[in-house]
Amino acid sequence: MGNTVAMILAGGQGTRLGVLTERIAKPAVPFGGKYRLIDFTLSNCVNSGIYRVGVLTQYRPHVLSKHIGIGRPWDLDRKDGGVEILPPYVGRHESDWYKGTANAVYQNLEFLEENDAELVLILSGDHVYAMNYNDLIDYHLLKEADGTIACMEVPIEEASRFGIMITDVDGRIVDFEEKPAKPRSNLASLGIYVFNYEFLKKVLIEDENDPNSSHDFGKDVIPRILRENLGSLYAFRFDGYWRDVGTLRSYWEANLELVLPVPPFNLYDPNWRFFTHTEEMPPAYVAPGSKVSTSLVSEGAEVYGNVFNSVIFQGVKIGRGTVVKNSVIMTRTEIGENCYLENVIIAENVKIGSNVRMGVGEDAESKLDPKVYSGLLTVVGMNSVIPDDMVIGKNCVIGIGVRPEDFKSKTLESGDYVIVREE
């Protein structure tokens, strides 16, 4: 099938995830009790036998770069091939940063040359899915295509969030529009492409020299290939599980789907394992008298209270008499005694005092940003401390690094927020 090199676009800011991505890139966001979002794409690569991988970073890359390291958890610490972090070649000007997804790959054509790329697999590092990329590549070769885009049908009311394509009866793409206001189809791009290298190189160089281009695959490169008939593009229909967890609501829902009796996304398939870089921790402990049901509880967690329909990450401690419902609690967060938390997302290393009630009260629109904070979820940023006896409503936001003295009273009404700005 030719020498395939994967390029993972991992520079996304993920602004719709609010405080969860204020200090880290979206692909580094924790997910599913022990993983980070990029783990799924990296694992798909190695499970598909693809061991030449470039990770293109940009926004807040430190946590992501540290997480990937030399790639050992994914068997990517190799002399021949392996994983390489590819930041932008930043000079003295901000314009030296990646200007778009196409420009990011263009800036790394030398990496592709060094790895003797014949096929280039372009992937997003912030989606949750399991895909054997060989199926995509086999289809691409069968069609003798210049490029192939993985796609799936989505509800027509959601189609304007995606790149939307129209195909002929043979699966060849005849039209493509990025996030159309009035979509003419519901066949959505998954942001997963395979290109013949020489073809990709040619169109990227041409795009780079186009002063009117924003240098993005979906907005510029794909439409131009079709408009000017530069090559053949085909649609590969994927019928497996795929989630774009780009909003707080979709992130929360995708986590809680994992606890269903028959989860739509299978973390337990021995033939398609997901790998990650985590700290070694002892087994989880559930104390006498505690109740845990329909939940994921990761290693190192200590549960002295009650947990229902929730995802509990590594090293989390839940105090006696505390109830956690429909929530996502991230690594090393500690919750005191006699608390009640419902419909909350708590980031890493948060300390919650005793007798705290969170996610309660009347419904209310967010006073901070209704476009980001909606769906009545209360969100707490990393490294915050919430004092004893607080009552925090629905759809509230506690920012990163908030301290007890930052709260003006013991009550935070639904829709309200406490944010401490960086110095």
Curated annotation (Swiss-Prot):
Residues given in the record as alpha-D-glucose 1-phosphate binding sites: Y98, G163, E178, K179, S189
Catalytic activity field: alpha-D-glucose 1-phosphate + ATP + H(+) = ADP-alpha-D-glucose + diphosphate
GO function terms (MF aspect): ATP binding; glucose-1-phosphate adenylyltransferase activity
Record InterPro entries: ADP-Glc_PPase, ADP_Glu_pyroP_CS, GlgC_bac, GlmU/GlgC-like_hexapep, NTP_transferase_dom, Nucleotide-diphossugar_trans, Trimer_LpxA-like_sf
Biological processes, Gene Ontology terms: glycogen biosynthetic process
Pathway in which this enzyme or protein is active: Glycan biosynthesis; glycogen biosynthesis
EC number: 2.7.7.27
EC class: transferase
Keyword tags: ATP-binding, Carbohydrate metabolism, Glycogen biosynthesis, Glycogen metabolism, Nucleotide-binding, Nucleotidyltransferase, Transferase
Entries under SUPFAM superfamilies matching the protein: Nucleotide-diphospho-sugar transferases (SSF53448), Trimeric LpxA-like enzymes (SSF51161)
Record's function text: Involved in the biosynthesis of ADP-glucose, a building block required for the elongation reactions to produce glycogen. Catalyzes the reaction between ATP and alpha-D-glucose 1-phosphate (G1P) to produce pyrophosphate and ADP-Glc.
Family statement drawn from the similarity comment of this UniProt entry: Belongs to the bacterial/plant glucose-1-phosphate adenylyltransferase family.
Assembly behavior: Homotetramer.
Stated name of the protein: Glucose-1-phosphate adenylyltransferase
